Amino acid sequence: MFNNLTQRLSDSLKKILNKGRLTEENIKETIREVRKALLEADVALSVIKKFIENVKKKSIGHEINKSLTPGQEFIKIVKHELIFAMGEKNHSLNFSIEPPAVILVVGLQGSGKTTSLAKLGKWIKNKYKKKILITSTDTYRAAAIEQLKILSDQIEIDFFESDKHHTPIEITKNAIKYAKLKLYDVLLIDTAGRLHIDKKMMNEIQQIQVISKAIETLLIVDSMMGQDAINMAKIFNNDLLISGIILTKTDGDSRSGIALSMRYITGKPIKFIGTGEKIISLEPFHPERIADRILGMNDIMSLIEDIEEKVDQSQIQKLTKKLKKGHDFNLNDFLTQIKQMKKIGGLNYFANKFSINHQLSNNISLLNTDKNTLKKIEAMICSMTPKERIKPIIIKGSRKRRIALGSGTQIQDVNKLLKNFDDIRRIMKKIKTDGIAKVIRGIKNMLPKKF
């Protein structure tokens, strides 16, 4: 989502970074470039105007911090204004109410509302260990309730099934009564979406909001909608007590202007962003980290948190102990690492987190290892016998043909896998003897290239 803006801003700021001193002339020239980058990213005009005013005011005639170069000082100002536009801090969910804490999810049909509710339930369950109940008041779309029930089963969260003949108001009342009776901590309510905003829809949600005494009402916004999403958010914000926003489909080719505009226009914080189709692809919105990502400083903290949450640490410790004892790294170990990688989202996930360094990402082939490649690798290893996985050296002609046939791949793919595995095994051996500093030089060839 931020790649294009990152590229444009990087090009603009690069020119001023190495300047010996800042003058009004070179500041204005850079600001013009920054303004153009923000316009292309579809940032709202009112936001751009305020952003540029603040940057100009703080940089022209501003006293330079002695520990920074003039260029670094200017970038620091730009970063501060990016953070200010997006909301300065992360706003967590509010649970400070007598249970159940009711969270409403509202938005247009097709915005990813129902899926986002399930993702949110999964996130709350993992983060806070709360007892959660999910229900749907969308009686207008035949498949809506069934879709949410299926998602609830997937994330192992209880679902309150309503009578299809009941009204959304009746469903809300019954769900709250049941949640209190069964001592649930949180009740997540999915409301009906529409293809466009209408008065009936708003009146219904307003009633649900009042009856449920919702402590959070989260607006789901499709980032692919651009300026239309901002106009839609204004209407929802005027008619409802919106507490925050979840921005969906940020892993696509959407322009990043919506992330920079939404809080400034509505006055409400972006609380989460949807980063993919998987049920775990939801992360809290941290303005400072996003600003770092936009400016090419890389989102290290989000990456670490994701790895800690999604990767099985016991498997890593197990492999480390095994290598320390002198055992060989085999294809069973490799398969375990591939499965861990898939949990995070494949190597393209890392490419997105570090997409700012374009020269680096273009040169490192491992960043092109996508989900399909990981699936192929897994299929090939699963088509091997236990002996072949432990001693891949025995895999010759006829065995390669059998593995390719069993995994639906080509013999060339099996050859590539074995070669890449051999490279990895050599690096694993080096870890024991040379230490990590020398090993790091071989990392770019460590993982399989795209088939």
From Swiss-Prot:
Keyword Thylakoid found: no
Catalysed reaction equations from the record: GTP + H2O = GDP + phosphate + H(+)
One biological process GO term for this chain? SRP-dependent cotranslational protein targeting to membrane
From the UniProt record, which GO molecular function terms apply?
Answer: 7S RNA binding; ATP hydrolysis activity; GTP binding; GTPase activity
EC numbers listed for it are 3.6.5.4
- Give one Pfam family, short name only: SRP_SPB
Predominantly, its location class is cytoplasm
Q: According to the UniProt record, what class of enzyme is this? A: hydrolase
Q: Which GO terms describe its cellular component?
A: signal recognition particle
What does the UniProt entry say about where the protein is found?
Cytoplasm
Annotated residues that bind GTP are located at 107-114, 190-194, 248-251
Kindly indicate whether the keyword Hydrolase belongs to this entry.
Answer: yes
Q: Which domain of life is it from?
A: Bacteria
Going by the UniProt record, its keywords in alphabetical order are: Cytoplasm, GTP-binding, Hydrolase, Nucleotide-binding, Ribonucleoprotein, RNA-binding, Signal recognition particle
Which InterPro entries does this one have? Answer: AAA+_ATPase, P-loop_NTPase, Signal_recog_part_SRP54_M_sf, Signal_recog_particl_SRP54_hlx, Signal_recog_particle_SRP54_M, SRP, SRP54, SRP54_GTPase_dom
Known role: Involved in targeting and insertion of nascent membrane proteins into the cytoplasmic membrane. Binds to the hydrophobic signal sequence of the ribosome-nascent chain (RNC) as it emerges from the ribosomes. The SRP-RNC complex is then targeted to the cytoplasmic membrane where it interacts with the SRP receptor FtsY. Interaction with FtsY leads to the transfer of the RNC complex to the Sec translocase for insertion into the membrane, the hydrolysis of GTP by both Ffh and FtsY, and the dissociation of the SRP-FtsY complex into the individual components.
* Domain comment quoted from the record: Composed of three domains: the N-terminal N domain, which is responsible for interactions with the ribosome, the central G domain, which binds GTP, and the C-terminal M domain, which binds the RNA and the signal sequence of the RNC.
State the family named in the UniProt similarity comment for this chain: Belongs to the GTP-binding SRP family. SRP54 subfamily.
Q: Assembly and interactions?
A: Part of the signal recognition particle protein translocation system, which is composed of SRP and FtsY. SRP is a ribonucleoprotein composed of Ffh and a 4.5S RNA molecule.
What protein name does the entry list? Signal recognition particle protein
